[in-house]
């Protein structure tokens, strides 16, 4: 994984964890959890691509990997919509910058996962 992507994930997760959004903090914690899960999934998919021979074991280990991939894309779309919504409603510039960076990162990761999945197909 690109070291800039790693630091971007870590930076955004750290910033999001510092935000105080009142009653919606439970939603924010859910977003943080999904961000972390997405990062781990992206890493494992990227590693499988790097070891192209691992495709066979990936399919054996997880016969439903396409279904899982579809689920991850749904999660990404949900996160993108949630981040866009937060971006529209927040007036705090720190939060706006954080959500803008999170949105950009999500779009980049979505593209990377698409690229990885096409290489695996």
Curated annotation (Swiss-Prot):
Disulfide bonds: none annotated. Belongs to the influenza viruses NEP family. It comes from Influenza A virus (strain A/Chicken/Hong Kong/YU562/2001 H5N1 genotype B). It comes from the Viruses. Interacts with protein M1. May interact with host nucleoporin RAB/HRB and exportin XPO1/CRM1. One of its GO terms (biological process) is exit of virus from host cell nucleus through nuclear pore. GO terms for cellular component: host cell nucleus; virion component. This is Nuclear export protein. InterPro entries: Flu_NS2. The lineage of its organism: Viruses, Riboviria, Orthornavirae, Negarnaviricota, Polyploviricotina.
């Amino acid at each position: 994984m690109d070291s800039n992507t790693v630091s971007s994930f870590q930076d955004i997760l750290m910033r999001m964890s510092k935000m105080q959004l009142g009653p919606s903090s439970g939603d924010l914690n859910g977003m943080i959890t999904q961000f972390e899960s997405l990062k781990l999934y992206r890493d494992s998919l990227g590693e499988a691509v790097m070891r192209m021979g691992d495709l066979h074991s990936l399919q054996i280990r997880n016969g439903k990997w396409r279904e899982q991939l579809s689920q991850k894309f749904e999660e990404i779309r949900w996160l993108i919509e949630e981040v866009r919504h937060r971006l529209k409603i927040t007036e705090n510039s720190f939060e706006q910058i954080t959500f803008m960076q999170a949105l950009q990162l999500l779009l980049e990761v979505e593209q990377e996962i698409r690229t990885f999945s096409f290489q695996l197909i």
